[in-house]
């Protein structure tokens, strides 16, 4: 699989995608959002990588272990900067690619499937991405979100 030349990823994102997929810290996370959708239906080029994890137990704290992620990222490239938004969210600028990590107390979509994609990297299924996009559109109005919903409807579940 030549991710670097994928139509779904911007060139600078494609260059780091495979290396990121080999990291241990990626295992509990699921790639969500426009990039996960683009990798499955190839309708637009995507630049950023949004990773989400949901906690299995009620008593677990929804937190991102950002020091561990930072250490692994620095072992394969350059972290330009990072922003610890909260205990449950951190954003890295890694090799000029925006990487976001989120932790949530439970799955918003209980039927979501994690699709194995490359090495340690999993994608959210298309139906779940559509549900997450609809929820996102309640908070913001970005053309890419509307386009993603349009693309999902147009595909009609052919990639499920």
Task: Give the ranges of each region predicted by the language model.
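Compositionally biased terminal segments of proteins
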Residues: 1-160
């Amino acid at each position: 699989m030549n991710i670097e030349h994928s139509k779904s990823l911007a060139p600078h994102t494609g260059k780091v995608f495979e290396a990121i997929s080999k990291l241990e810290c990626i295992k509990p996370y699921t790639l969500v959002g426009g990039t996960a959708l683009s990798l499955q239906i190839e309708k637009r080029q995507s630049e950023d990588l949004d990773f989400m994890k949901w906690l299995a137990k009620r008593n677990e704290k929804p937190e991102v272990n950002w020091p561990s992620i930072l250490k692994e990222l620095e072992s394969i490239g350059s972290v330009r900067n990072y922003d610890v938004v909260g205990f449950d969210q951190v954003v890295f600028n890694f090799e000029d690619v925006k990487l976001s990590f989120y932790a949530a107390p439970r799955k918003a979509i209980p039927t979501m499937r994690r699709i194995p994609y490359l090495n340690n990297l999993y994608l959210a299924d298309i139906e779940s991405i559509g549900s997450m996009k609809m929820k996102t559109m309640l908070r913001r109005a970005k053309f890419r979100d509307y386009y993603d919903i349009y693309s999902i409807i147009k595909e009609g579940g052919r990639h499920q």
